[in-house]
Every structure is written in structure tokens, then in C-alpha cells.
A protein has these predicted regions:
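Hydrophobic, small-residue-rich alpha-helical packing segments that form membrane-like cores
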Residues: 15-18, 77, 90-92
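A structural signal for short loop-to-beta-strand junctions that line the ligand-binding cleft
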Residues: 106-118
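Early extracytoplasmic/lumenal segment of secretory-pathway proteins
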Residues: 64-75
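Mobile, glycine-rich extracellular loop/lid and propeptide segments
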Residues: 75-78, 85
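Pocket-lining segment of extracytoplasmic ligand-binding domains
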Residues: 93-95, 102-104, 165-217
């Protein structure tokens, strides 16, 4: 069969842009139609959603979304406000409420434009089977991830509303899971979209379970 050779420049706007690097109009057009989206940490749901949005919304040089790996919901708030080149961010709904309630920022919600809800997140607690529910966490060593993410915000809010007073520790999730297995922690709180990799990849030897979270209270 006869093969037909195609000129890549005729079918690829990207190639046209690359090889017209000297064109001021090309530079302006690329920058005008590109937005950056700060997401979350590697392995989290935000990163995957960022990649999915970039793929679904891609419209050649008319619209391009560039997802950026971030540090978590709280850090993303600061990045959107202050970091040069960041246009959008994925932020947990309760993060802005927490920052205002605790006096970190006044009227911070007025500094943002809400775009859309992406999905629901779940709060899960991995613990030894001796811990049946959150009410058993008083005085226990509980990891709530690092303080620049959103997990600690959700966890501390739930603890306050339920009147629970654990020993809160800020440990990166993968490290926290290992400490839990070694008996150095009593529970690990995870908040994210389902399925969350740190939960689904957790190698349970039968000693641990997803303990109950009493939302009704």
C-alpha cells in the first residue's frame, strides 16, 4: 500500500509554536491561553484530577491547563495568593473556614473566586483493631499528615466537634503508615478522594482496620 507522509507542522499546533519561537505573537498567544493549576502531593487525588482536567480541557493553543504538584490544601491557598505564575488551585472546602476561624487570615474567602466543586472527599482512620472508633483516640498518638495540607484541618475540626483530645502528630502519610505498623502510632487519619493510594496500598497483616468515624455526632 502506498504510504502518505504528513508534514507534522500541518497537523500539530505545538510544533508550529516550537518552530516559530521568534514570533512575539506566538509567545503572547501561548501565555494568554495557558493557566496553571496547583494540585496536591504525589499519590494524592488532587494530582490525578489535575492531570485529568489538563487532558479533558486541552484545546490545542486555544486553552491549555498546566497542573503543578503542590504541598496540600493550606499551602495551595498561599500559593494562589502569593506565588507568581499560579492561576488556579484545588483547595478543600473546609480549609478557608479553618484559616478564618483560627485567625490566620481575615475575610480570606473574599480574595478568591469559586470555580466549581470537583468531588466529595472521605475522612478515614486506619488503626489497630483495639481502637474501634474515634472516641477511643483520647490521649492516643494520631498522625494527621503535614501541616501544609488539608487533612490536619479536617481532622482537628472533627476532633474539636466531637470533644476528642488525642496527641496530634504531623507526619507525612507514607512515613506515618510505617510508624503505625511498628507500633509508634495509634492511628493515622487520611482525607481524600476515593480511592486514596496511601489507603489502598496499605499492606495490612490483619492487625489493622478502618475504624468508625461518628459523623452523626
Amino acid at each position: 500500500a502506498e504510504q502518505t507522509e504528513y508534514d507534522p507542522s500541518k497537523v500539530s499546533d505545538s510544533l508550529k509554536a516550537i518552530f516559530q519561537f521568534g514570533s512575539t505573537s506566538t509567545k503572547q498567544a501561548l501565555n494568554a491561553n495557558t493557566v496553571t493549576l496547583i494540585t496536591g502531593t504525589i499519590g494524592g487525588t488532587y494530582v490525578q484530577f489535575g492531570a485529568d482536567l489538563a487532558s479533558v480541557l486541552d484545546d490545542g493553543n486555544k486553552l491549555r491547563v498546566l497542573p503543578i504538584v503542590g504541598r496540600g490544601s493550606v499551602q495551595s491557598v498561599a500559593d494562589i495568593l502569593f506565588l507568581q505564575g499560579v492561576d488556579l488551585g484545588v483547595v478543600r472546602a473546609d480549609t478557608l473556614d479553618y484559616l478564618e476561624r483560627k485567625g490566620f487570615a481575615k475575610d480570606i474567602k473574599k480574595q478568591f473566586t469559586y470555580v466549581t466543586k470537583l468531588y466529595n472527599e472521605e475522612m478515614q482512620m486506619i488503626a489497630p483493631k483495639s481502637i474501634a472508633s474515634m472516641k477511643d483516640l483520647n490521649g492516643k498518638r494520631v498522625s494527621v499528615d503535614l501541616p501544609n495540607g488539608g487533612t490536619f484541618v479536617t481532622a482537628l475540626t472533627v476532633f474539636e466537634r466531637l470533644g476528642i483530645k488525642p496527641q496530634v502528630l504531623y507526619i507525612e502519610q507514607r512515613i506515618a503508615m510505617e510508624k503505625l505498623k511498628k507500633g509508634e502510632l495509634d492511628a493515622v487519619i487520611v482525607t481524600g478522594g476515593k480511592p486514596y493510594k496511601s489507603v489502598s496500598n496499605f499492606k495490612n497483616d490483619g492487625r489493622f482496620h478502618l475504624a468508625s468515624v461518628e459523623w452523626a455526632k
